[in-house]
Amino acid sequence: MATSKTLFFNVKRNEPQLVVAEKPTPNEIKQLSDIDDQEGLRFLLPVIFIYPPIVGGKLDPVKIIRDGLAKALVFYHPFAGRIFEGPNRKLMVNCNNEGVMFVEADADVELKRLRDGILSIWPHVEEFMCKVEDCGGIIGCPLLFIQVTRFTCGGFILGIKLNHTMADIYGLMLFLNATSELLKSASTPSFPPVWQRELLSARSSPRITCTHYEFDELVSDDQNPKDNFIRASIFFGSKEIQALRNQLPTNPILSYSRFDLITACLWKCRTIALEPNPRELSRVSIVVTGVLCRSPLTYALDLVQQAKAQASQEYVKLVADLLVIKGRPKYATRLNYLVSDITSFRFDKFDLGCGKPLYAGVPLATSTISSYSNSKNDKGEDGVFVPICLPSLAMEKFQNELKKMINCGLISKI
């Protein structure tokens, strides 16, 4: 049972089913790349789509989505397979058409009663995702866990957990677009899938030619096991973005994007809230925390732009080389902040034949990772939704720092 302030509701899940490709597919083994099978990607990535009531109310989203998956898996057949480990824990996918997990569910509440503004649904987001038992969701498990939850009003939520070693958000978008196109009578997807994982593998003679701070082994990754982490969300609309721009010089030398402004703001507020040793290193790129905390926003902005400039094809190859040479080192988590901007993928325009979603994106953050999604606030204003996750003591300080920057607090806490 879940609660929303004084509202109680139940989500009844049916027994899980396996959806397979509707036509025979190649039975083969495909090797993942050195980037794919790194330790830092061995997790399930949650994605959620919230849809209003279907016009006319006669279409069943469960049947529509289940049928579309069976069609799309004919072309994206590796998604219906299973990951296994080869020698040296190398990940491979057995394309055996065992299928993706699919759960039909019903919530005994109207969608509009569950939320005070669309973003307040997040405390209950796990109710709309498949429960993943025992296997941990990576080795020998379905590569997609999908749940469709219908509401009494006719609205529904599509919740997906994606094995991140198999694909990223862009790969999932292509798969879902294929699902939509095939449901609308297309004979093939407009963007046929291409494997080519060798493009993300180490070179025949791997080499390390630069410092990779994101895998820095000299930095302690220890976290206090007693830390009580809190999840929350922030909405950056035009008012918040303008508040950040107002802190820039009158005639800035550089042009800063919305992504730059949001990332610099969150990075600085987060670093101050975590109260690190002023001489420690804080990373979106590399910087001494004391300097970041006391410097103006433009200092963080310039470092964000430097970090973006480093993300070249050559750098990806260098990362693959390092992963092979050093045996898949884990991401450094101490004062490391990873951000992913998926606003350009326009998940909020994704139509399965049931209309466009009210919200679509990655709904939850980890202690080190946040994703930026397009969204609307409860006033219908367009903006960017950002989930965050911090220790409870740091969250209060983070909110205070955020108010100083944009005169706005957190939207919701989980």
Model feature map: region roles:
Residues 2-29, 41-78, 82-347:
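Soluble acyl-CoA-dependent acyltransferase catalytic core bearing the H(X)4D motif
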Residues 179-187, 404-413:
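A common structural junction motif
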